[in-house]
Amino acid sequence: MAKEELIELNGIVDEVLPDSRYRVKLDNGIEVGAYASGRMRKHRIRILAGDRVTLEMSPYDLTKGRINFRHKDERSGPPSRPPQHRR
């Protein structure tokens, strides 16, 4: 299948399922099953419930998708560590 045939949609992760699968609610209100792309797994990009993502879907099966981008928001920065106490 050529890359031009894929449909790109945006959505929000509703639920994190076992085996690195996700349930995503698209902007048009439809819920689909999705998995993280190999590049996201390779770079250990963590996807949590509530994250805004972009996914690719095949026009032949609109119930499954591949997450290929996690959008940054105000809460996705690195966790702040408490200050170190020196003696």
Swiss-Prot record:
Any one GO cellular component localisation term in the record: cytosol
Q: Where in the cell is it found?
A: Cytoplasm
Q: Which GO terms describe its molecular function?
A: ribosome binding; rRNA binding; translation initiation factor activity
Keywords of this protein's UniProt record, alphabetized?
Answer: Cytoplasm, Initiation factor, Protein biosynthesis, RNA-binding, rRNA-binding
Q: List every stretch annotated Disordered.
A: 66-87
* Disulphide bond pairs: none
Give the highest taxon in the source lineage: Bacteria
Matching Gene3D superfamilies: Nucleic acid-binding proteins
Please provide an example of a Pfam family that matches this protein in its UniProt record.
eIF-1a
According to the entry, every stretch annotated as the S1-like domain falls at 1-72
Question: InterPro entries, per this entry?
Answer: NA-bd_OB-fold, RNA-binding_domain_S1_IF1, S1_domain, TIF_IF1
UniProt similarity note:
Belongs to the IF-1 family.
What is the recorded function of this protein according to its Swiss-Prot or TrEMBL entry? One of the essential components for the initiation of protein synthesis. Stabilizes the binding of IF-2 and IF-3 on the 30S subunit to which N-formylmethionyl-tRNA(fMet) subsequently binds. Helps modulate mRNA selection, yielding the 30S pre-initiation complex (PIC). Upon addition of the 50S ribosomal subunit IF-1, IF-2 and IF-3 are released leaving the mature 70S translation initiation complex.
Question: What does the subunit comment say?
Answer: Component of the 30S ribosomal translation pre-initiation complex which assembles on the 30S ribosome in the order IF-2 and IF-3, IF-1 and N-formylmethionyl-tRNA(fMet); mRNA recruitment can occur at any time during PIC assembly.
Q: What is this protein called?
A: Translation initiation factor IF-1 1
